[in-house]
């Protein structure tokens, strides 16, 4: 019998033939720790009795949730992180370069077929290049830092096939939101999602990142895309035989297969306050809004900003509506600036902020108060995430979000 992509990655890593449900120990290729968890990881690492990192070059520390500090306690996280990095010889430290999940792929830390762990649930993002990237807690991370290994249970795989050409006003965000709605918030718990089909093949790596990023919102352990020439170009590598083999075999055993026609997708939103509460944008039209946020590790990439700029070009943000745009990384910020994208956004009335997690995690300027309503491109709309527990958060694509900013209410984008 053939293998799924996740089975091939684990088999290559461990040297063992594996099947779903097997518990194995994997060798870790890279880890990521962000500023929220570094104090706890560091304390637990030393509490466990470790005196050195298994491989300092394979450890990446990224400050993104708390930069620049907006609360006094935030600086403690930076001090603890810097102390830990200096003490244990870590060189891969990013203090103001952008969001962890953007930087891990953008800076070349993750390659196709790698096994990567991160202290964040959206570590699943790296599946966009064909890596296996589970999110873990700080205790597990401390153990990896000392040993370079971690146990996992081999997940079952749900195959998602998408064929055809997407409508012009639909983005990959609409695809993953629809899938989450169909599966439910726990419909893929501890399972791998494996994406294929002509629509997927034609996607940019950035679009695949959006889908992989939000896979956890259906409970998935990972979302995997077969490495191709786009992947190789993005990662600035030539794919080796192992990486080229990372596609599901025809006779592989899948838990189930879900098939979509690309032409059937329409702009959708996740309604307050559940990510799997999906509605067509058309049935929500006319709902007044107070703010729009375009950014995050889900939709803060160059193509996202460009899509928003195309909608906003020559237009103005509606009166009494605030538009906040946060690029996912410094590199994206500079690219968007050179291309005139930031000018277009600013001329339309957008407030453009420094790269980072920003409003998505409610730690930067732009939080909302009771009764306010925001359309946002991030990945979660839980109660209290972007302000008080009485804020309504609607999740949407950058095109939809930009169109709503101009209209001052929920609308369906035309292009």
Please give the residue ranges for each predicted region:
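Fe-S-dependent hydro-lyases/dehydratases of central metabolism
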Residues: 1-415
């Amino acid at each position: 019998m053939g293998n799924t992509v996740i089975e091939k990655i684990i088999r290559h890593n461990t040297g063992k033939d594996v099947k779903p449900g097997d518990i194995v120990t994997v060798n870790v290729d890279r880890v990521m720790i962000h500023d929220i968890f570094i104090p706890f990881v560091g304390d637990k690492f030393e509490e466990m009795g470790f005196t050195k990192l298994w491989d300092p070059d394979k450890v990446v520390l990224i400050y993104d949730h708390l930069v620049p500090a907006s609360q006094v306690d935030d600086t403690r996280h930076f001090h603890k992180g810097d102390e830990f990095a200096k003490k244990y010889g870590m060189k891969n430290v990013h203090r103001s370069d952008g969001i962890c999940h953007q930087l891990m792929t953008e800076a070349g830390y993750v390659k196709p077929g790698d096994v990567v762990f991160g202290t964040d649930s959206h570590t699943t993002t790296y599946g966009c290049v064909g890596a296996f990237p589970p999110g873990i807690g700080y205790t597990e991370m401390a153990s990896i830092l000392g040993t370079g290994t971690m146990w996992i249970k081999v997940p079952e795989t749900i195959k998602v096939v998408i064929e055809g050409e997407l409508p012009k006003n639909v983005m990959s965000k609409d695809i993953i939101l629809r899938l989450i709605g169909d599966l439910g918030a726990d419909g893929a718990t501890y399972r791998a999602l494996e994406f294929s089909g002509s629509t997927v093949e034609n996607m940019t790596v950035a679009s695949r990142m959006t889908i992989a990023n939000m896979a956890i919102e259906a409970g998935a352990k990972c979302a995997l895309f077969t490495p191709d020439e786009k992947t190789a170009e993005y990662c600035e590598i030539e794919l080796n035989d192992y990486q080229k083999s990372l596609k599901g075999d025809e006779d592989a055993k899948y838990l189930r297969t879900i098939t979509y026609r690309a032409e059937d997708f329409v702009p959708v939103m996740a309604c307050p306050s559940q990510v799997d509460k999906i509605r067509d944008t058309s049935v929500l039209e006319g709902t007044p809004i107070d703010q729009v946020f375009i950014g995050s590790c889900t939709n803060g990439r160059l193509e996202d900003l460009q899509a928003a700029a195309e909608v906003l070009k020559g237009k103005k943000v509606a009166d009494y509506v605030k538009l906040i745009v946060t690029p996912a990384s410094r590199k994206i910020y500079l690219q968007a600036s050179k291309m005139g994208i930031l000018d277009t956004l600013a001329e339309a009335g957008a407030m453009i902020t420094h790269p980072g997690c920003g409003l998505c995690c409610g730690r930067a300027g732009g939080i909302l108060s009771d009764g306010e309503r925001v359309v946002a491109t991030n990945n979660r709309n839980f109660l209290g995430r972007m302000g008080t527990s009485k804020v309504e958060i609607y999740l949407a694509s950058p095109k939809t979000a930009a169109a709503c900013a101009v209209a001052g209410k929920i609308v369906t984008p035309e292009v």
